[in-house]
Each structure stands twice: as structure tokens, then as C-alpha cells.
Amino acid sequence: MISRRVFLKTAGAVLVGSRASLRGGAAVNAVRYVDVAGSAGISFQHDNAASPEKYLIETMGSGCGWIDYDQNGLLDLYLVNGASRRPNTSKHALRSALYRNNGDGTFTDVTIKAGVEAEGLVGMGAAVGDYDNDGFPDLFVLGYGRCILFHNNGNGTFTDVTDRAGVGNIRKWGSSAAWFDYDNDGLLDLVIANYVDWSPEENFWCGDKGPGLRSYCHPDVYRGQPPTLYHNNGDGTFSDVSKRSGVGIRPGNGLGVVTFDYDNDGWQDIFITNDQMPNFLFHNNRDGTFREIGYSAGVAVGIDGQFEAGMGTDAADTTGSGRSDLIVTHLDQQLARLYQNVGEGYFEDATFRSKISYATFHLSGFGTRFMDYDNDGARDLFMANGHVLDNIQRYHAETTYAEPKLMFRNVGHGIFENVSDQLGPDFLLPRVSRGAAIGDFDNDGDLDIIISNNGQAPQLLRNDGGNANHWFQLLLIGTRSNRDAVGARVKVTAGDLVLYDEKKGGMSYQSAQDPRLHFGLGQHTTVEEVEIKWPSGELTKLTNIKSDQILAIEEGKGLVDRPFPRVPLRSA
């Protein structure tokens, strides 16, 4: 995991056709991100159980997630914890934490009352989805050796149904997961990116024995684990279809996952990032099986053909083509890769042309999202960074353990500009970041960020100023389709601005995202048309919608009344 790669400034970086700028807002917005975690009452501290033995599980987690568990229109927060001692002991067991959004800028720890401690789990990630279509989101917590499924009882409490449901992922190292409906039967299935076959008994000595510098072992030291795919049987149980579906045939060093329809055929595909081996892109064959096509699609490796430390990922349309592009974050001395979807089932490595290469070369990226942070109508790119070695400066004096975050502003024509130093001191504060989830926790129309930090307190970065431009958010509610509407495609037209999005599963690194779709509108105050194609094939069209509001749309019915209370601004 600490191996270096030669920086290849490839002269043949792939170029793509220029497009008109997507931006519909002011050229620059005075957006600042302010860390309000402390003033909001979030006292959580991640424990990584750091030890001289350098157990690999110490450095890989953990994640976080937004979940409106009580369905009051306010995003609540789940933070995954690690382990406090050796992974094979139960002493001093830690717990993860659920914080309820009070609607006044503060949160209350309701973990014990809700019953979602996940105590004793060496926690990694979280995934949120309503697997039984009862209207209340359920919580899946990933970990080393096992995972936990908490069923939402609808009364503020959860029940551990892992054994009954059959989704324990036993003896595997689950990193990230995605709820999605791969067979379009109206029920959410579950795919898990599993990491490596590591154990405390095989925690080999890696590093430089001369000066006694120990490091975490490279993933190549261990055998990779294949992904897991669980099919939802519709009766509260799941069947492991990993092998017969084709998803679990090949081992991988899986860390991140996103499900999206890369070829716009109406069926969700699976992309999994792998650490120091080719990434997986599983094409949905529409018959319950998948075919791995990473190399032929152009996303297995970057343009230089080297294996890289694939960690976080996301998919979104960044050019207005109506096709979803991909981002993959990597270790420092590598590059975060931006793969542009050029159609016909193929992606091109646009990392150099997009101008994200230089800034990402020096940092280790984990959580990442495409997001319109300034609401100008173009999706920008966020990355949470942090090295994997706490003693990295003893190897490389110029590299630090804690690292700053990155924000790249989409300036159109497939080009991004690094604006990280314009977003305030809290945004630049170095941390050992892992998971990241984007969500509008105060319902003011601009996107906030929760970041989980390894061995540190989380950061809740409130977006101040992003709503100077106009915006529009949608909560999609499936009826014939799965209730979360994962797989739905949306087209929004506001004047000359045409935006595309789809309801995806997974994203980022070990983290669960805001379930609502967010659209920045720039200076447009009216959305002329919203077109939704549901996974069932049904079409919904709405016209002449005012901007600056959150709407709930139910399949087959249209607009439905749901509360989305605005949270008053509170000083940090």
C-alpha cells in the first residue's frame, strides 16, 4: 500500500470533444465550508486501534452515512466506528453512533435508544436502503469478518435481522456496499465490495527492517476476496447469488462501489474499485447475470496501464452528455482517474485533460463525490484525503499523514479548476479522512459534507453561500419500482440548462448519501420540465416548477406532500 508509482505525464492523454459550458450561475460564488460538528453536538471519536503491530484493519476505515430514519424530512447521521483492541478480542468494545437531527442545527445521540450500536464490530462502512419497501430506511453496517443488517421498525428503533435475512457476509472483509435493484423486480438487492483475506494470525512484518520502520502490508501480500451479491427474496430474506450471477467469480481487492446505468439501457450496472489490481465493471445482462468488462470499457486501469490503489468512486454526468462519467481516487504518487463516458459502452481516461491530475498526485484520496457545491448547474468534484501510514514522514519527509481536502470546480468543456483554497480554513484543515457523504442536512438548498476521519473526530462541513444561486431537489418514491427509486433517471430543463441524473447506489467510500437528487439551477427561477423514467419503465412529467424547494414525487401519482423543514442558521 505504500509502494510508489512513477508519475507519467502521458503525451497521448485522450482528448474529448469540447462542449459548451454547463454553467448557468454567476462566475464565482462566495461559498465557505464551516465545520459545525462541535457546535452541533456531535461528540463522536473514531478509534482505529492503532498499534505497533500495524494490523491492516487499523487504517482502512471508517465510513459514515445520512439516513432520515424517522422520516421527518431531516437527515440524521450515522458514524461507523472501528475497534479498540486486537481484532480477535471483545474487551473494550466500541460502538458506532446514530445522531438525530433536531431541526435547529444540533444533533442528539440516540444510538442506544435506536439499538444500532454495532458493538464489537470492527466497523468499516454503511449503506442505507428500504429493502422491504415499508417506507422506513434500513441500515447495513459493514465490517471485518461480518456485517450487520438493522431493520427500521418505524418507531425510532431498529432490530438486528442479519441472521434471518442471511446477509452476514461471514469471514469476509466488507468495505463498501450498494443497495440497488439489479433485476428490476421492485426489491432492493445488495452488492458488497470485499477487500482482502487478512487475519491477525497472518499479520506479516512489512516495511524496512534496517531502521525498524514497520508499515501496513501491501494488499498483494494477501489473497483478494470476490464481491458478494445478495438477491432480495421479498420475504425478508436474501439469497447469495454471487457466483451464479457472475459477480463473485473473480477475487478482487474491493474498496469502493457505485451502481449506475453506464450504457443507459434501463438496467443498473456495478463498478467496483480494486486496490492495486484492475477495477471491475459488471455489465448487467438483464437475465440475472453480469459480465465483467472493465478492460474493454476502458475503466480497469488508467491510460498508462498501471495497477493503482482504487479506493473511492462516484458516477455522474459532468459534461451534459446524458451519460455518467466515473471518478476513482488513489494513493499518493498516483492520480485520481476521471473516466469520461463517450458512449457506445466505452470510457476514455480524461484525467490530464480535465486538469485534476496535478493536485491529486500528492494526496491519498478516499471519499469522493460529484456535487454542485455552488448551485451553478455543473457538477463539481470533491475528494476527502488522508494517508494510510501514520509514520509516512519517516519514509518520505514531504508526505504527511493528515491531508487537506480537494474541491474541483467544473468550469465547463470537461475542465475542472482547483478551488480548495477558496472555501475557508475549515475546508483546508488536514485530517486523516476516509468516508465522506454529501447531503443537505439543514434543507437550505446547498450541499453539506460529513467526513469520517481515521482515529479522529468527524467533520460536518456546512455549506454557507452555495444557495446564492437557485436550486431544486427531488425525493423519488417508487411504487411499482423499488421504493427508493434506485435506477430512476431524471432530466431537468430550466431555460437553456439541461441536467441529467440517476438514482444510484453506493458511491464515495464506505458511506451512504442523501437519498434526494440535487440540481443547481444558477440564475434560473423556474424549472420548465422534469422528466422521470422509473425503473419500471413508467414516465412522469412535471412542468413549471418553482426553484428553491424540495419536492417529493411518487411513481404513478406525481407530487405528494412531504415535510422538509428548513433548519435555521446557527453559529459554529
Task: Kindly label every feature range from the protein language model.
Residues 50, 356-358, 390, 398-572:
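Gly/Ser/Thr/Pro-enriched helix-cap/hinge segments flanking short amphipathic alpha-helices
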Residues 1-15:
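N-terminal secretory signal peptides and thylakoid transit peptides that target proteins
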Residues 89-94, 145, 220-225, 276-277, ...:
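Short, solvent-exposed loop/turn segments at conserved positions within beta-propeller repeat blades
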Residues 77-81, 138-143, 190-194, 270-273, ...:
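Hydrophobic beta-strand segments that make up the repeating blades of beta-propeller
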Residues 61-71, 123-133, 151, 175-184, ...:
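Beta-propeller blade termini
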Residues 96, 147-149, 227, 278-281, ...:
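Structural signal for beta-propeller blades
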Residues 2, 25-58, 99-121, 151-172, ...:
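Blade-edge motifs of beta-propeller repeat domains
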Residues 83-86, 197-199, 277, 333, ...:
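Short glycine/acidic-enriched loop and turn motifs that connect beta-strands
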